[in-house]
């Protein structure tokens, strides 16, 4: 059964390398979301942006922001760990605790700079109706994203190149 959480902070990422391989480039315009749990990789989520009323389904191709073990968020639907550290002005620990490898993150011992709990590539924002350039999106975020996870992979039907009605549909 899919989980839904409202009021997520979503920000933009344009990493050239994802945990799953090659990342986003201006040329490939790869659609992806990063979630803070490595076992979410290759799964699908539905995002809805209330301000535009649009939704899209996108694959998890990277981990983050900040963490890759936030199972309370992803598996149990609790608020993201990064939100708590940000809102309480609390630094991330810098000591490894089992699979929580605090010492391995670049923000170890620092307060997160944002409460972002998901990162999106620019084409995902465009699918959600955000009319900003790639450069403008680099500093763009919203606080009202709705995410439903995990959902079935979308079925994408190939479109006729000339957009004419196929013969088999004509009366």
What is each residue range found by the language model?
Residues 1-169:
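Secreted/periplasmic proteins
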């Amino acid at each position: 059964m899919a989980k839904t959480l409202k009021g997520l902070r979503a920000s933009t990422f344009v990493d050239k390398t994802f945990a799953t391989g090659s990342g986003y480039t201006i040329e490939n315009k790869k659609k992806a979301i990063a979630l803070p749990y490595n076992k979410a990789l290759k799964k699908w989520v539905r995002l809805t942006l209330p301000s535009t009323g649009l939704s899209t389904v996108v694959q998890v191709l990277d981990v983050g922001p900040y963490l890759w073990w936030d199972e309370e968020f992803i598996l149990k639907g609790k608020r993201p760990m990064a939100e708590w550290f940000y809102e309480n002005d609390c630094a991330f620990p810098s000591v490894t605790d089992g699979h929580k490898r605090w010492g391995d993150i670049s923000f170890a011992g620092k307060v997160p700079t944002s409460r972002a709990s998901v990162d999106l590539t620019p084409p995902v924002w465009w699918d959600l109706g955000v009319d900003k350039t790639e450069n403008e999106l680099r500093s763009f975020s919203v606080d009202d994203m709705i995410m439903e996870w995990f959902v079935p992979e979308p079925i994408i039907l190939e479109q006729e190149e000339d957009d004419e009605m196929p013969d088999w549909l004509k009366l």
